[in-house]
Amino acid sequence: MESFLFTSESVNEGHPDKLCDQVSDAVLDACLAQDPDSKVACETCTKTNMVMVFGEITTKANIDYEKIVRDTCRSIGFVSADVGLDADNCKVLVNIEQQSPDIAQGVHGHLTKRPEDVGAGDQGHMFGYATDETPELMPLSHVLATKLGARLTEVRKNGTCAWLRPDGKTQVTVEYNNDNGAMVPIRVHTVLISTQHDETVTNEQIAADLKEHVIKPVIPEKYLDDKTIFHLNPSGRFVIGGPHGDAGLTGRKIIIDTYGGWGAHGGGAFSGKDPTKVDRSGAYIVRQAAKSIVANGLARRAIVQVSYAIGVPEPLSVFVDTYGTGKIPDKDILKIVKENFDFRPGMISINLDLKRGGNARFQKTAAYGHFGRDDPDFTWETVKPLKWEKVPASS
């Protein structure tokens, strides 16, 4: 069996694009907490000493946008200009308007439609993916890259590696076998970490600390061997980071948010969007469908696509592919999916409880991935029991 290499990357919560995702979702959380019917399309951008929130929001909630921006930046660790942004003294610009009445009447009839009649907020197609290679039913390359990033933040905030600063990126290359369509990880081929750091630390200490406190606790020993390659801050210096180093924008890390390059992506970002935006709710329901297919033993690996037209409740199409790993034909799995999942946007909101804000619910999704997380707020990760007849093995 010939092996192959596949790579996934991640970025930390202090990466400028991820800062923007978290601000946009913090605004969404605040709106939904006060008014579950809020219509939110909130974008954020940032550059040196400046964060701007802009977009269309229709809500009864009373929102202090500037406070949300500063609180979010502070919680990430942007507390002074030398780490990339000073949450308390940076410029905060706000340019929020109401949702277009044309869109409002077409999608939700100015709140007069029943949930099952609510139309999709826009056209588009979304994909959900699942694979049996990890307990999370997520790709290993993506899981490891994501967990390395989360661990970097953990050891920065708890003081284990006090030289760390908020910005950082990770990348993991995994060697796989293809077992008749199922993905079987063999080993980790390469680990790349580029992390922002202070002026005092040496490259030797960076490498030693990253191996001991970040890589060791995250990557299971069985995947590492003496051939595994480590690139630890290969550029040699990463002091300037965050919005000081690069501009940031909501919605620019859509592969990190999903499956690390596996499966497919329809192109729509998640953060700052309320559940009538099918870019988000549609992607969540097809993840639940794909995960349920694999968890119920219908297949070892699955991708599910759904598509929509603006103002139309029923999906235009639903597609299932199990990459040849299905225990029954894909057309039969598709039938089971259609019988068990309601893809109408208003019903997705109800069935996945997506109008509930607060508890930093959506802000949590905005760093370290929307899928494969063990958190009751991530309702789309709940596996639905699917009834199906096992085909008797031929003698």
From Swiss-Prot:
CDD domains: S-AdoMet_synt. One of its GO terms (molecular function) is methionine adenosyltransferase activity. Pathway: Amino-acid biosynthesis; S-adenosyl-L-methionine biosynthesis; S-adenosyl-L-methionine from L-methionine: step 1/1. K(+) binds at residue 43. Pfam families: S-AdoMet_synt_C, S-AdoMet_synt_M, S-AdoMet_synt_N. One of its GO terms (cellular component) is cytoplasm. PROSITE patterns: ADOMET_SYNTHASE_1, ADOMET_SYNTHASE_2. HAMAP family: S_AdoMet_synth1 (MF_00086). Homotetramer. This is S-adenosylmethionine synthase 2.
